[in-house]
Amino acid sequence: MYSYIKGKVVNNGQNFVIVDNNNIGYHIIVSNPYFYEINKEYKFFVHFHIKENLQILYGFNDNKNLLFFKKLLDVPTIGPKSALMLSETDNLEQVFQAIENNDNVYLRKFPGIGIKSAQQIILKLKGDLIFSEKIILNPKKTELEKILLNLGFVKKEIKSVLNQIDDKKELELMLKEVLLKLAKNI
């Protein structure tokens, strides 16, 4: 329904800001409302969440955080509050790494995330953070992934093998190592 709302923050509370856009005040739930200065204009990437008889806007500074939030909502044990805390962390890359490395201890540091929820997040999202691959992978690994996809390999297998190799080598040597590892999996 909404992609983003751009406007002036006119008020903030414990977990929300009120954004004035063309004389309409939007109540947007955010992780840290005190980050936003009153009477200053911001752009919020928003998710319109409908629950029973409630309609709620969740706001993010960056579209990447919004996309991750939406993916978290697909995890059965994760609700909007927990998803907001995970997706608005200062170090989103570290959350992605924790998911890719099965690190449920790191994920449990977030409020509302227990062992079951952490395991569900890893199970549901590992290898599926497509929008974040530029953060997780360096340029050589991104190039390797494109080559391997063109050769017909499956994305999940590729990501698994790419996480095992040293990215400080030449691209050709990395490709050879990846192909050998993928051949062992066949």
Swiss-Prot record:
Has three domains with a flexible linker between the domains II and III and assumes an 'L' shape. Domain III is highly mobile and contacts RuvB. Its main location: cytoplasm. Belongs to the RuvA family. GO terms for cellular component: cytoplasm; Holliday junction resolvase complex. Residues 134-135 are annotated as: Flexible linker. It is found in: Cytoplasm. The gene is ruvA. The keyword tRNA processing does not apply. GO terms for biological process: DNA recombination; DNA repair. It comes from the Bacteria. This is Holliday junction branch migration complex subunit RuvA. Residues 62-134 are annotated as: Domain II. HAMAP family: DNA_HJ_migration_RuvA. Residues 136-186 are annotated as: Domain III.
